[in-house]
Amino acid sequence: MPPRKRIGDIMLEHGFITEDQLQLALVEQKKTGELLGSVLFGLGFISQKNLFKVLSATQQDDRSAPAKEDSGLDVPEEIDYLVQQSSAIFQKTTDLHKAELDSPHSPLVNLVEKILINGIRRGATDVHINPDMKGVRIRYRVDGVLHHGMFLPGKLLNPIVSRIKVMGRMNIAETRLPQDGSAEFFYKNRGLDLRISSFPVIGGENIVIRILDKSQVLVGLESLGFLEEDIESIAESLALPYGMILVTGPTGSGKTTSLYSFLSMINSVNRNMFTIEDPVEYHLPLARQAQVNVKAGLTFATGLRSILRQDPDVILVGEMRDSETAELAVRAALTGHLVFSTLHTNDAVSSIVRLTDIGIDPFLVSSTIDTIVAQRLARILCVHCKEPLPADNPAYQAAAADPAVHTLYRSIGCRACDNSGFKGRTVIYEILKVNRRIRELINKRASIDDILQAAIDNGFHGMNVIGMKKVLLGITTLEEVRSLARSAN
């Protein structure tokens, strides 16, 4: 069977682009990981019409031929199919508004499904559908970083948005106001929850879809990246009959995953466990889980009040968003319950001050909080392409690493990691254990610096220490840890 023609070659043969334009596009493609056709279209080197001609030609080739890793010209099979689908739909745009927005046989439904499946395959947590001056830009957030997916013709924006709104049970006629919706999506016998947000911007409506896989298996703390000695410290806190354990960090830092891993360590038939969340991200056996429904009047505060009448042993409050919820959670911890929750603070010590700043009595804070874990997620170097740094690289001196003992690495990029150089993430964290001295300082409304010094005297170290350990182990890069340390400070 003859080798499949590459898209770049076909474009050159037809005179649609020049060799110089192709080389420029390949350089850009290596930076972004984008489809070659999308790069050429985005740079203005090829028109939509000519791009679709090339895609039609590639469709006639053998689709089973594998792409060569070093060519830089072949399009991955599932992406190629998605682009060809968009081409077919674009040719039928006059019929798009006549098509049923929820018909399984509609080409529009098929296109939206392919966009979602592509994100799921890439391990995306979010799918972004953005109006762009040149068309519709599809992007995927993978390992915390947005990656280009593809460009679609601008005429497809409104039909795609309408289809997604139908899925999310949103008002397709309302385009002037932001809306939120949710949908269930099945892929390979897995039920996924989609959280949909629309926002009107210049050029149309911007759509972001959060992908939640409730069926994913909870992993242990070691798999998340916690070190053995710190797992033992956390286990000691989990053995307490009452008190409060907090996990803090920005959105997307893995707080919920860590909390559920904590809960799974103590989940048993002998404990009555409740959660109130927005949304419920994991299913936990034996736990009674509730989801916030503001429209129906079920908030974190009202849910927590009712849970306290259900004879709970362990309570997870997804987030302490306001003073009412925070005070209820703190009082629950004071009255014989083990309470878990999250806060949006940059570091562990700041969480203490945040609670007192929103009006919680320092005595209640000092009497209930036992452990605070602040965390970030660092990208893991791709094992297939990471490259050792030479011994004279300045990174060794910056990391205080001896090249004879440790090997530092840099990211390169390959097909296995979608040319990003990273695959997966590991937790970078700090653990604050609230001892007697820190409790005294909380009661005195001491400053963050005073509490931090007391914590250091008790063996506390910042998350940069854990980060540097993982650099020396070859798990991540010095640049990645430095970036996270800056955000923590």
Features from the language model and the residues they span:
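Non-catalytic accessory regions
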Residues: 1-91, 477
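Short, flexible helix-loop junctions that flank or precede catalytic/ligand sites
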Residues: 18, 96-118, 122-489
